[in-house]
């Protein structure tokens, strides 16, 4: 049975626990697609809240998986499985636990690859936790590359109970044309999660997923998938289309803008997709993206920006106040953002653009805007003491600035 290449295995074993928390929280829907013929759900509930995300795969979870698999496949060697997953458990990260679960299932479950997958398909409705089902896709990606069509169909099945967006990517790498043809067929699937997988799984730069370099270089092969899904009834699916297009803007912004210019942006759902797809370009002040949404003209305003308090500590709330006065005799459409220059550990700075609002400013009008946020550390951002510069950006142009000191 074929195993993944070393590079694929290395990717799967990366420590991404904090990031995967965001991934898991984004799926705010219960796994209610239960098999009416399945045994009653006996999986342990998710700890509330779990001490660490990796505790989603703890001894109790593994015992429940073993019990269910034994009822599905009586020859399943539960003791071997438990020994494999519990040995060295504490030292394993979340994704290492996911992968070890897949490896241990393969070693303890007799039969061919297809027989094992069919047993796991019976298990899927019984798990009752969307993130835990990710090990099912990991199993397919690890052992199924040589049984391409069967494995792709297995991923289509498993994604209904969680998501196979990471697991499908090795198949795209192995045979892009074949994989994308099958994924295009998924765009007509009655289940929104399968339709979403067609777009999300083929994103060139899926966050925390394996990068699809061929699609980074040339995004055209996924165009038929996005075209088929742009009018999807599900916001869950349409958001994926927008994120997919946003990925492409990072390498081919003119390509995306040309496609969007051909859309009927008077239709609200298409306008939403287009704007969400161009969010990075708009924050960067890209003229073509700004023009597409009516923000192409330089703002005629007098602007002031203030930060309060001017000195604060981590955990306190920062309030920004922008005072705008129109100097134009005509109404103006304005996209307003703010840019924080965060102090780095080295003493330098790195900027991040935040969305503020969009307004129609009447001729010669005055307006005051207020924005506040708590200054706290995240898994993706650590704050350092020092003077932070904040700029006000309107229609892509920096028009005012202020400072605050973080102690």
How should each PLM-predicted stretch be described?
Residues 377-387:
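Short glycine/proline/serine/threonine-rich loop/turn segments at secondary-structure transition edges
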Residues 318-325, 329-344:
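Beta-strand-rich binding/interaction modules
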Residues 307-312:
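Short beta-strand segments of immunoglobulin-like
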Residues 345-357:
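Short beta-strand and strand-turn-strand segments in soluble, beta-rich domains
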Residues 354-374:
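Intrinsically disordered, low-complexity Pro/Gly/Ser/Thr-rich segments with frequent PxxP/GP/PP motifs
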Residues 378, 394-400:
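Short acidic/polar inter-strand loop motif in beta-rich domains
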Residues 42-289, 313, 330-333:
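Surface-facing alpha-helical segments and adjacent helix-coil boundary elements at the starts of domains
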């Amino acid at each position: 049975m074929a195993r993944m290449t070393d590079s694929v295995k290395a990717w799967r074993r990366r420590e991404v626990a904090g990031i995967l928390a965001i991934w898991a929280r984004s799926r705010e829907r219960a796994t209610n697609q239960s098999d009416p013929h399945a045994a009653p759900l006996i999986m342990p509930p998710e700890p509330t809240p779990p001490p660490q995300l990796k505790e989603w795969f703890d001894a109790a979870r593994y015992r429940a998986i073993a019990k269910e698999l034994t009822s599905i496949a009586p020859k399943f060697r539960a003791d071997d499985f438990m020994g494999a997953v519990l040995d060295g458990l504490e030292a394993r990260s979340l994704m290492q636990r996911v992968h070890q679960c897949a490896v241990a299932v393969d070693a303890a479950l007799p039969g061919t690859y297809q027989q094992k997958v069919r047993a796991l398909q019976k298990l899927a409705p019984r798990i009752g936790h969307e993130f835990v089902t990710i090990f099912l896709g990991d199993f397919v990606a690890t052992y199924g590359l040589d049984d391409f069509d069967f494995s792709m169909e297995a991923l289509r099945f498993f994604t209904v109970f969680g998501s196979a967006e990471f697991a499908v990517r090795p198949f795209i790498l192995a045979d892009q044309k074949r994989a994308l043809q099958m994924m295009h067929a998924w765009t007509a699937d009655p289940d929104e999660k399968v339709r979403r997988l067609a777009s999300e799984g083929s994103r060139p730069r899926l966050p925390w997923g394996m990068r699809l370099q061929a699609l980074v270089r040339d995004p055209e092969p996924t165009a038929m998938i996005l075209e088929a899904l742009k009018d999807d009834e599900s916001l869950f699916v349409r958001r994926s289309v927008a994120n997919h297009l946003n990925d492409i803007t990072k390498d081919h912004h003119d390509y995306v803008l040309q496609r969007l210019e051909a859309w009927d942006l008077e239709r609200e759902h298409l306008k939403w997709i287009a704007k969400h797809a161009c969010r990075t370009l708009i924050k960067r002040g890209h003229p073509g993206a700004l023009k597409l949404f009516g923000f192409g003209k330089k703002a005629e305003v007098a602007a002031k920006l203030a930060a309060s308090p001017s000195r604060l500590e981590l955990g306190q709330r920062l309030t920004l106040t922008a005072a705008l006065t129109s100097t134009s005799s005509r109404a103006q459409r304005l996209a307003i953002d703010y840019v924080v220059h965060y102090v780095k550990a080295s003493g330098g700075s790195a900027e991040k653009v935040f969305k503020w609002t969009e307004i129609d400013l009447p001729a010669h009008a005055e307006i005051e805007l207020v924005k506040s946020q708590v200054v706290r550390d995240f898994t993706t951002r650590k704050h350092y003491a020092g003077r932070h510069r904040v700029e006000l950006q309107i229609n892509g142009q920096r028009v005012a600035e202020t400072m605050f000191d973080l102690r």
